[in-house]
């Protein structure tokens, strides 16, 4: 079984883990209703994608 020969220091461990943190998502705005949404997705409030009506949304 493989065993490390020497102990890794805390600094070396933390430098390796520096890229593991969660990144903030970049919200886009719908071109039709200006609703905040994730990029490359259909707008859940109006049903538009890329300036075109893709699906119909029933109003509550």
UniProtKB/Swiss-Prot annotation:
One of the GO biological process terms: translation
Biased composition (Basic residues): 1-16
Any single Gene Ontology cellular-component annotation: large ribosomal subunit
Region of interest (Disordered), residue spans: 1-20
Similarity remark: Belongs to the bacterial ribosomal protein bL32 family.
InterPro entries (UniProt xref): Ribosomal_bL32 (IPR002677), Ribosomal_bL32_bact (IPR044957), Ribosomal_zn-bd (IPR011332)
Pfam families: Ribosomal_L32p (PF01783)
GO molecular-function terms, A-Z: structural constituent of ribosome
Domain of life, per lineage: Bacteria
Keyword annotations from UniProtKB, A to Z: Ribonucleoprotein, Ribosomal protein
SUPFAM superfamilies: Zn-binding ribosomal proteins (SSF57829)
Name of the protein described by the UniProt record: Large ribosomal subunit protein bL32
């Amino acid at each position: 079984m493989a065993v490390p020969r020497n102990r890794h220091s805390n600094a070396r461990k933390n430098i390796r883990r520096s890229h593991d943190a969660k990144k903030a998502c970049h919200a886009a705005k719908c071109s039709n209703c200006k609703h905040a949404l994730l990029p490359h997705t259909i707008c859940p409030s109006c049903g538009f994608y890329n300036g075109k009506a893709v699906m119909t949304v029933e109003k509550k």
